[in-house]
């Protein structure tokens, strides 16, 4: 049989090993439009990918359960080459990796990993255990299986992630890797009508005699007869018409009149018919037709072989051998026109906020604080958190787009870790000063002012003025049944000075004793429950209702409204105190100035006196005359009783 020059050149190329081609043993499985090879070798993931690239492939993908079975078949063949093996777990690299910095997404099937050969994520996964959540290092995936057991179709190899390894340390339990090679089509294996042997050499340097499908551009070496008298023929798998691949041969190979149809059905795919002279021919069953190779049968219905993949449906063209593929909703045909791929609807931005693409469909998601709306839930509307029966805020709640915030009544501030609680403001401890003239008592959301004995609370509820001192406290009037009034009249614990300006502290804190504080001058006083300490039993308190303003100071309530001249009396009293203080300070300054002038003059006189010159006479003094006249008398007077 003649062979073209191009075929000889191809054979020459195939006869030379490719640079870097794997010299290790391997197993090959071809199906559909791809071939899978399994290899022994303790390599890092990067080295394994390089070995696959050298022959035009990539580390294998496992995008479906069907593809997982093809990979398992390759591993089964590979394990037979070294049987028996010891019982241990072995790992084989596949083309699933996660780059450094890409974190794990446990809610997705792929968990943030992607295929090195490209392609979209798929819904299929078969993880051995939970993935590491660390994003610091690159991670790679291998198939893990017990090397001593024959892989079972119901137990597909699990995915195991680990560090990608280095040439010096390829990884723990790494035994090999799997490659995948894609082709535009496949040829059927050559069928022999008599004794002989067929050896296939693939474009990725695999040599085997057992392939269920032979990839495009492979060469078949056919040796007919026994080894001593063998006849060799070479055939090339090529594409006759778009989508149709064959070897370019006609009739069965290695036919022998001695065997006829009894040997391998004469090499025919379906029926074999023998002639009277020892010859035979191939035929097809009803509904099929014999192809040009005179061996293979093809259905007259082009859709009988289900050429459409990816969920596509085949539709034959009437009175023709042609067909078309149609995809389900959410899918479209790729460039081959026979495979359906998912449509990414999110590229058209159909959602108001976030869009999540799924296989054959998509769904919209809303941000926190929003909820889906619209007929297809493609829109998002704000969630009114404040409208709920259980408002998240202790007091006021203000809704905003996608969120909310809490507010508090006057006299309170927002508090809590989530800023939903309200805490009372202690106006009496304000760093800017006491809002009262004398005593200050904090209450929930407000405060009250009081005065020491002999003083009365001014109508404005802040200042204290001289008033009538009562010798005993009147009894407390009956309590009102209104809970709000009762709450206002209760005095919280506080420290109370016994005089205006806080000159003396009272250490005892206010307790509920049932006392009623009042004055004979109309004030804003209200019933108040406080404790009068035993050591200061003569202390008298005059308290008035007082509410804080936004500036931190206070203003009287409507109960404290009085005439304008009453406020003026309090102000005049304060002015009197201020003027008296100024006069006293001025007198002290005048006195200090006079003392200073006196001391300066005295010092100046002493300085002049020290500088005055002295004469010699200043060191002598005159003897009194009386002393001179008496000296002779005292010196020479005779002694009584003597003659002198």
From Swiss-Prot:
Question: What stretches pass through the bilayer?
Answer: 573-593
In terms of PROSITE patterns, this protein maps to: ASX_HYDROXYL, C_TYPE_LECTIN_2, EGF_2, EGF_3, EGF_CA
CC annotations in GO:
cell surface; cytoplasmic vesicle; plasma membrane
Location(s) in or outside the cell = Cell membrane
Tissue spec: Expressed in lung, heart and bone marrow. Expressed at lower level in ovary, whole embryo and fetal liver. Not detected in brain, adult liver or thymus. Highly expressed in peritoneal cavity and bone marrow macrophages. Not detected in epithelial cells.
Per the record, residues carrying Phosphoserine are: 619
Extracellular-side positions: 23-572
Cross-referenced SMART domains: CLECT (SM00034), EGF (SM00181), EGF_CA (SM00179)
The modified positions for Phosphotyrosine read 620, 636
Explain the post-translational modification.
N- and O-glycosylated. Phosphorylated on Tyr-620 and Tyr-636 by SRC; these phosphorylations promote endothelial cell adhesion and migration.
Comp. bias regions, Basic and acidic residues:
478-489
Q: Which InterPro entries match?
A: C-type_lectin-like (IPR001304), C-type_lectin-like/link_sf (IPR016186), C-type_lectin_domain (IPR051505), cEGF (IPR026823), CTDL_fold (IPR016187), EGF-like_Ca-bd_dom (IPR001881), EGF-like_dom (IPR000742), EGF-type_Asp/Asn_hydroxyl_site (IPR000152)
> Know the name of this protein?
Complement component C1q receptor
Quaternary structure, per UniProt, is: Homodimer. Interacts with C1QBP; the association may represent a cell surface C1q receptor. Interacts with surfactant protein A/SFTPA1. Interacts with multimerin-2/MMRN2. Interacts with DAG1; this interaction plays an important role in endothelial cell migration. Interacts with CBL. Interacts with IGFBP7. Interacts with VEGFR2.
Q: What is its main location?
A: membrane
List the ranges whose topology is Cytoplasmic: 594-644
Topology of this chain in the membrane: Single-pass type I membrane protein
Provide the EGF-like domain boundaries. 257-298, 299-341, 342-381, 382-423, 424-465
Description of the deletion phenotype: Homozygous CD93-deficient mice are viable and fertile under specific pathogen-free conditions. However, they are defective in the clearance of apoptotic cells in vivo. In addition, CD93 deficiency results in metastatic dissemination by impairing the vessel integrity in a VEGFR2-dependent manner. In the postischemic brain tissue, CD93 deficiency leads to increased inflammatory cell infiltration.
Q: Could you tell me which Pfam families the record lists for this protein?
A: cEGF (PF12662), EGF_CA (PF07645), Lectin_C (PF00059)
Its function, per the record, reads: Cell surface receptor that plays a role in various physiological processes including inflammation, phagocytosis, and cell adhesion. Plays a role in phagocytosis and enhances the uptake of apoptotic cells and immune complexes by acting as a receptor for defense collagens including surfactant protein A/SFTPA1, C1q, and mannose-binding lectin (MBL2). Plays a role in the regulation of endothelial cell function and adhesion by activating angiogenesis.
Q: Name one GO biological process term.
A: cell-cell adhesion
Q: Which cysteines are joined by disulfide bonds?
A: 140-164, 261-272, 268-282, 284-297, 303-314, 308-325, 327-340, 346-355, 351-364, 366-380, 386-397, 393-406, 408-422, 428-440, 436-449, 451-464
- What PANTHER family does this protein's entry cite? C-TYPE LECTIN DOMAIN FAMILY 14 MEMBER A PRECURSOR-RELATED (PTHR14789:SF8), CHONDROLECTIN VARIANT CHODLFDELTAE (PTHR14789)
């Amino acid at each position: 049989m003649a062979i073209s020059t191009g075929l000889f050149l191809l054979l020459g190329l195939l006869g030379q090993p490719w640079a870097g081609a794997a010299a290790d043993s391997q197993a090959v499985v071809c199906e559909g439009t791809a071939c899978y090879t399994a290899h022994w070798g303790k390599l890092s993931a990067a080295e394994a990918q390089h070995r696959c690239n050298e022959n035009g492939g990539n580390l294998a993908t496992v995008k479906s359960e069907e593809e997982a079975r093809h990979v398992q078949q390759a591993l089964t063949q590979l394990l037979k080459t070294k049987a028996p093996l010891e019982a241990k777990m072995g790992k084989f690299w596949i083309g699933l990796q996660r780059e450094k910095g890409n974190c794990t997404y446990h809610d997705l099937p792929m968990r943030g990993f992607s295929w090195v050969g490209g392609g979209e994520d798929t819904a299929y996964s078969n993880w051995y255990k939970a993935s590491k959540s660390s994003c610091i290092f690159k991670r790679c995936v291998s198939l893990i299986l017990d090397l001593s057991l024959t892989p079972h179709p119901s137990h597909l190899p699990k995915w195991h992630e680990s560090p990608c390894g280095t040439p010096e340390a390829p990884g723990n339990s790494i035994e090999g890797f799997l490659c995948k090679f894609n082709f535009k089509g496949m040829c059927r294996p050559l069928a022999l009508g008599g004794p002989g042997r067929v050896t296939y050499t693939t474009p990725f340097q695999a040599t085997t005699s057992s392939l269920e499908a032979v990839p495009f551009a492979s060469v078949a070496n056919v040796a007919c007869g026994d080894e001593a008298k063998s006849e060799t023929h070479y055939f090339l798998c090529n594409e006759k018409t778009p989508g149709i691949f064959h070897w370019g041969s006609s009739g069965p190979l290695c036919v022998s009149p001695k065997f006829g149809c009894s040997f391998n059905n004469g090499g025919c795919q379906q029926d074999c018919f023998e002639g009277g002279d020892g010859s035979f021919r191939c035929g097809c069953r009803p509904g099929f037709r014999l192809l040009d190779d005179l061996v293979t049968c093809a259905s007259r219905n082009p859709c009988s072989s289900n050429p459409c993949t990816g969920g596509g449906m085949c539709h034959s063209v009437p009175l023709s051998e042609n067909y078309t593929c149609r995809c389900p909703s959410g899918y479209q045909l790729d460039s081959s026109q026979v495979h359906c791929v998912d449509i990414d609807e999110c590229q058209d931005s159909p959602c108001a906020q976030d869009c999540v693409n799924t296989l054959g469909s998509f769904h919209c998601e809303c941000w926190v604080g929003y909820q889906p709306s619209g007929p297809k839930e493609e829109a998002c509307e704000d969630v009114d958190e404040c409208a709920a029966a259980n408002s998240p805020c202790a007091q006021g709640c203000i809704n905003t787009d996608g969120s909310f915030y809490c507010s508090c009544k006057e006299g309170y501030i927002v508090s809590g870790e989530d800023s939903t609680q309200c805490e009372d403001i202690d106006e009496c401890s304000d760093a800017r000063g006491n809002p009262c003239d004398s005593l200050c008592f904090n209450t929930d959301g407000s405060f009250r002012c009081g005065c020491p004995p002999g003083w009365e609370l001014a109508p404005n509820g802040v200042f204290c003025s001289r008033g009538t001192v009562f010798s005993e406290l009147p009894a407390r009037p009956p309590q009102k049944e209104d809970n709000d009034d009762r709450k206002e009249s209760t005095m919280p614990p506080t420290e109370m000075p016994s005089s205006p300006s806080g000159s003396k502290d009272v250490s005892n804190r206010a307790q509920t004793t049932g006392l009623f504080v009042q004055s004979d001058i109309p004030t804003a006083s209200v019933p108040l429950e406080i404790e009068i300490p035993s050591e200061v039993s003569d202390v008298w308190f005059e308290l008035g209702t007082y509410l804080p303003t936004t500036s931190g100071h206070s203003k009287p309530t409507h109960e404290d409204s009085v005439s304008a001249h009453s406020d003026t009396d309090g102000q005049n009293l304060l002015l009197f105190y201020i003027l008296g203080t100024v006069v006293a300070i001025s007198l002290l300054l005048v006195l200090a100035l006079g003392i200073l002038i006196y001391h300066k003059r005295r010092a100046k006189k002493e300085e002049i006196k020290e500088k005055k010159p002295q004469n010699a006479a200043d060191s002598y003094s005159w003897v009194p005359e009386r002393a001179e006249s008496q000296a002779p008398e005292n010196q020479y007077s005779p002694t009584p009783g003597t003659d002198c």
